Amino acid sequence: MRFTKFYAPSLKEAPKDASLPSHIFLTRAGFIEQIGSGLYNFLPLGKRVLDKIKNIVKEEMDKAGAQEVNLSFITPASLWQESGRYNVFGKELLRFKDRKENEFVLGPTHEEAMLSLVKNKITSYKQLPLHLYQIGLKFRDEARPRFGLLRCREFLMKDGYSFHANEEDLGCEFELMYKTYSQILQRMGLDFRAVEADSGAIGGSGSKEFMVLAKNGEDDILICENCDYAANVEAAKRAKKTCQDERPEANYASKFHTPNIKTIDSLAQFFKINAFYTIKAVVKKAIYENESKLVVFFIRGSDDLQEIKAQNACSALELVDASEEELEKAGLVAGFIGFVGLKDIDFYIDFELENEKQMIMGANEKDYHLIGIDVVNLNKDRFKDLIEVKEGDCCAKCGAKLKQSKGIEVGHIFKLGQKYSKAMNANFLDENGKSQPFYMGCYGIGVSRLLAVAIEASHDEKGCIWNKTLAPFVLEIIVSNLKDEKALEFANKLYEDLTNLGLEVLLDDRNERFGVKMNDFELMGFPYALVIGKGLENNEIELIQREGLVKELIKTDELMEILKKKVL
């Protein structure tokens, strides 16, 4: 492609709302253009990268035996109501009516639509397993779209759904998709981890996220460097903590006057103990479909509450902070809340506290705490995983220290089980002739998001740094002076030869200053550039590698051999 014929408008300034490198550089370099809040056009450069990502995804999915379909972007609301997700999904689900008052949604995911596609058509276990996928647009009405393609409202996604006769077969497909997604990301040259994850509004049991490691990542992940354990902080587990400091001793539930001791730090100082031996109460207002109520979560004083875990524990749609007025109305005394004698309030206790002895917690009375508390003889259903695992905690799998890192989610695979098929009455006949709901799996990968993630993971202060797999052009030929007829002739001949070899080459034949051309090369980030200038008089041209901006003078008679080694 000749630059004079190619549409790639670059900008000197970054968008005012751009803070991340991918947003800044992809916009400035002419890969994408914002047309509204969270809405982006893909220009030719961006479309070339997008197509490469799509092709890799498609090749690997097809290789795994999945079949491609293309579902409507719009889904009847009745399908979402049937599955029970219509209200659960919240305001991110864009709902609208047509002129006949029929209700529809713009699909952020397509579980319901895909299940509807096979319902009453796949009727026997002999037709299973089946895996269908699509690569298409999704819409999620984000409250605060930001970070360019990383959190936008309209996005391109590959979503696949598998149908099985039993849980064992679903497990096999889950493992196959784990390997397939790993292969997709490896082919793209991305440093990633597959981590344990929360299933969110999609639901299901088994869940793994694929995280690309990047310092600007919005997700915290915990990685064990001794074994293969890795998890999103929302789902991370640890080996149970211990403490060697002296434990307080007292008769069971002794009441102790603690004037104005409202915080864990002040409580630990007051009793001259480690906060490990205290119990912290965190009060939240749980939002449900038709009601809201206060819920108390009890965790060790030295720990912090993980809100997604807490939300899952009480099956709420959302958790928000409770006001002082709400606490007073419920009869709760801020700073002095405990589970002994707590009435008419739902509460949960972190499972690490089960069977702990000689603990200290609030007495549900102003300026009083209970000491000598044994966490025993409580309903097992009250014990949940509630705490936030942190760097330095020990791996639940091998006991080694966990390290915290930043990552960006690019893919998510779920074992949905029978959640959707039961809700939508989608059944098949098993080998005994008995009607059974399908076992389902769900597998998503953010195609347009990967474009931004690649740059978050690979850039410098000058611009993008693409690898050869994803780059819109692998090589740019830059003629430093268009008035140099010999250089221009050499460049044109080289361009034709390399193009005929199947190499994706951009010939910068613009009548611009050399500095402008170099700035654009550094901004757009193609893996290599050949600069043809005065050195041609000595049969030399300059090869520049974008990563590190490494420069090398090459003799013209050695050029093709070197390009075949490094570029082709």
Swiss-Prot record:
Known EC number: 6.1.1.15
Places the protein is found: Cytoplasm
Pfam families per UniProt: HGTP_anticodon, tRNA-synt_2b, tRNA_edit
Xref: PROSITE patterns: AA_TRNA_LIGASE_II
Class of this enzyme: ligase
SUPFAM superfamilies (alphabetical): Class II aaRS ABD-related, Class II aaRS and biotin synthetases, YbaK/ProRS associated domain
Catalysed reactions, semicolon-separated: tRNA(Pro) + L-proline + ATP = L-prolyl-tRNA(Pro) + AMP + diphosphate
GO MF annotations in UniProt: aminoacyl-tRNA deacylase activity; ATP binding; proline-tRNA ligase activity
Keywords from the named record: Aminoacyl-tRNA synthetase, ATP-binding, Cytoplasm, Ligase, Nucleotide-binding, Protein biosynthesis
InterPro entries to which the protein is assigned, alphabetical: aa-tRNA-synt_IIb (IPR002314), aa-tRNA-synth_II (IPR006195), aa-tRNA-synth_II/BPL/LPL (IPR045864), Anticodon-bd (IPR004154), Anticodon-bd_dom_sf (IPR036621), Pro-tRNA-ligase_IIa (IPR002316), Pro-tRNA-synth_IIa_bac-type (IPR004500), Pro-tRNA-Synthase_IIa_type1 (IPR023717)
An annotated GO BP: prolyl-tRNA aminoacylation
Keyword field contains Endoplasmic reticulum: no
Primary residence: cytoplasm
GO cellular component: cytosol
Family in the record: Belongs to the class-II aminoacyl-tRNA synthetase family. ProS type 1 subfamily.
Oligomer status and interactors: Homodimer.
Domain comment quoted from the record: Consists of three domains: the N-terminal catalytic domain, the editing domain and the C-terminal anticodon-binding domain.
Function: Catalyzes the attachment of proline to tRNA(Pro) in a two-step reaction: proline is first activated by ATP to form Pro-AMP and then transferred to the acceptor end of tRNA(Pro). As ProRS can inadvertently accommodate and process non-cognate amino acids such as alanine and cysteine, to avoid such errors it has two additional distinct editing activities against alanine. One activity is designated as 'pretransfer' editing and involves the tRNA(Pro)-independent hydrolysis of activated Ala-AMP.
Name of the protein described by the UniProt record: Proline--tRNA ligase
Organism (species): Campylobacter jejuni subsp. jejuni serotype O:6 (strain 81116 / NCTC 11828)
